Amino acid sequence: MELRQLKSFIKVAELLNFSAASKALCITQSTLSQQIQQLEQELDVQLLQRNSHSVSLTESGEELLPLAHQTLYDAGVCKSRMNDLKALLAGTLNIGATHTFSSILTETLLDFMKLYPKVKLNIHYKSMEELMDMLKKNKVDLVLAFKPSRRYEGVESHILFNNHLAAIVNNHHPLAKNETVTLSEIGKYDIALPAKGLQARNAFEQVISHYSPQFRVRLELNEVHILLKLIKQSDLVTILSEATIHDEHGVKAIPIDAPESGMEGCVHLLKNNYRKRSALEFIRLLSESNAIRERIRDWLTE
């Protein structure tokens, strides 16, 4: 049994389509079919039910799938441990982050690549729910996101920095002179909100759940960078974390004066999992970056 056969089986099980799986794996469809057949012959079971229109997992396939995932994960851990034992950072580091972390990460990404040129970085910007799913499936080594409103089974969250939910306006907006802003003050202006599912939107809805102000929502967007461009060129108000506008010119973040408006920036890791040295190094550099400049949590050096 070879790891590539298990990788092929997992991809077919995920996509339930040989053509799509072969493209995703960058191999020919005939090679993919051959690898699946060899795996079935070696295990002496049928893993996939095929017909001209669809592919589905057999009972044996359903049983093998989690074992195949675990085998590939264990193989990856083995490789990472060997690299770490050689005291030479190498290999691949997969990082998941919510969109609001993009401006915070720039400095650390550049520093890390200079210090560790043999480590390839894969950065995935997605929603919190998508990232937590990737973390549980070992598709990313760590997730950078604000502290979620609910607990995720098997995931531990460590605070990197404290932050607040804020009204974001351009420098010439009437609210720009404020040090803080109330919900009733925000209600006087047209609002462009981040889309539902994004962390800032979730945090805002939690804050306003105890109030009954009416907001003039004119627009919803799932792309933070476009949202900020609109704010710079109009009198719209948006709601994001303060950290989102790190290194952004022409806009101001005004903390919202309301209970539960805190947003803690966190690194999320799987419990009881091997932690790559490269992952810990990345977290250390991030903690020491100008974008955060907060104390390193004790867990990092344990």
Task: Outline where the language-model segments fall.
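Beta-alpha-beta core module
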Residues: 152-158, 162-163, 225-274
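A short LG(V/I)-centered, amphipathic sequence patch enriched
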Residues: 40-59
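Alpha-helical linker/hinge and terminal dimerization helices associated
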Residues: 42-43, 64-86
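Secondary-structure junction motif
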Residues: 190-211, 275-283, 289-301
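Flexible hinge/capping segments at coil-to-helix
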Residues: 154-191
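Short helix-boundary/capping micro-motifs
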Residues: 10-28
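Short beta-strand-centered segments that line the small-molecule binding cleft or hinge
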Residues: 107-111, 129-165, 169, 232-233, ...
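N-terminal winged-helix
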Residues: 30, 34, 80, 86-116, ...
